């Protein structure tokens, strides 16, 4: 809530980043479901054109480029222990979300048209992930876990709306009507890349765990560098390529039977 003199404003918002629930189905079978962010877009850049040769007639030109939105992943999966220590799993995934990109040119001279253009994208996709995991005891109280996952590449579907609005303050009757068109993404035009992940963990009984994971996705054939709304505009150069990440982590629970552990 914000208030200053006779101005008042209030805003309520709610958001969450990760939510997962798991439950046993049978002695060797368990299921889980959850929701997590997949991608986020959030940027805003402003520049001014001050070249005297240009602004002598147009006035200072302000260019603002902005992008916002994101995609969310809803998933449902199951894991099954085939034999002692060896487990396999499968996960269904649904991606959905909206992305918005705007490009505004504002003229200070009211006899020139200001232009606002951009893209509104409503996107979704369905895919699946498969995994395998093996756990073996190394010594008394120490075990190792090795695992791998693979997510299938899939076509990104939805609609991409391109719009352009021109405005002028001094000659209202000469302002062109807003222009826009909507393109339905055909199958295979844009793809979400497949993903390969491998990892290894060491577990010290029920007290501590240390792990390292490697994930690789090849986006070079995703088509995003060719389709309007995804591809770069103007002289900027964009080319989708391979994304790789290495992640490591460590956790410790000194006393798993402590009542404070169950109250977390």
Stretch-by-stretch model annotation:
Residues 1-13:
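Surface-exposed strand-loop-strand hairpins of Gram-negative outer-membrane beta-barrel proteins
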Residues 16, 24-264:
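Outer-membrane beta-barrel porins/channels
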